């Protein structure tokens, strides 16, 4: 329901299988996964490797640990393909309006996806024309930056919770005052 009506007037091609997806892409093909980190990523990579050709790009936009991205980058490159581990931040609003993106991995892949990533990323600046996306480095760098980002974000949330608790308990303020 969240996406209902949002594709009106846009060019989308629905696919029912990885085979159909790959067949609908132009070379060099770029396939972005947004799945839960862990074994599912390896399963999808192995399935894609059977369908893609040398020079095609696999992109992991999940919250993967950077050491897994380093391993996967090496594995995919050994098969002749390129791999990008991309930190993606912004939640539901980012999904709809553009996320902050932190790509890293196979450096040869960046020029091939840069225009796409910068087009779909959030924009900042006085004219909202500066993309929230820049290449952050090789191997697991993108997911490393996302890990640091999450650490800062969770630290900020904890600080807000503790300040709220102190103001409520020690300061005697109620929820409406806070």
Identify the meaning behind each predicted range:
Residues 1-20:
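NAD(P)-binding Rossmann-fold cofactor-contacting core
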Residues 1-2, 32, 93:
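Tryptophan-centric aromatic hotspots in well-structured domains and transmembrane helices
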Residues 3-7, 29, 98-101:
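Short low-complexity, flexible loop/linker segments enriched in glycine and/or proline
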Residues 4, 24-27, 47, 119, ...:
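Residues within well-ordered alpha-helical secondary structure of globular protein domains
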Residues 5-7, 52, 56, 121-127:
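Alpha-helix termini
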Residues 14-84:
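Rossmann-fold NAD(P) dinucleotide-binding segment
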Residues 18, 175-178:
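Alpha-helix initiation and N-capping motif
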Residues 41-44, 60, 65-176:
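Rossmann-fold dinucleotide-binding core
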């Amino acid at each position: 329901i969240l996406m209902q009506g949002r594709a009106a007037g846009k060019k989308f091609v629905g696919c029912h299988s990885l085979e159909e997806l790959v067949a609908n892409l132009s070379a060099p093909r770029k396939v972005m996964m947004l799945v839960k980190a862990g074994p599912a990523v390896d399963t999808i990579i192995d399935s894609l490797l059977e369908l893609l050709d040398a020079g095609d790009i696999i992109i992991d936009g999940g919250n993967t640990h950077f050491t897994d991205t380093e391993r996967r980058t090496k594995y995919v490159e050994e098969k002749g393909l390129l791999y990008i581990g991309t930190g993606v931040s912004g939640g539901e609003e980012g999904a709809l309006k553009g996320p902050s993106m932190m790509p890293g991995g196979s450096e040869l892949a960046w020029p091939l996806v840069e225009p796409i990533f910068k087009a779909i990323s959030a924009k900042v600046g006085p004219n909202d024309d500066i993309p929230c996306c820049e290449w952050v480095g090789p191997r697991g760098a993108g997911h490393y930056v996302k890990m640091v980002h999450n650490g800062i974000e969770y630290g900020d949330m904890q600080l807000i919770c503790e300040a709220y608790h102190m103001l409520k308990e020690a300061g005697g303020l109620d929820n409406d005052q806070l």
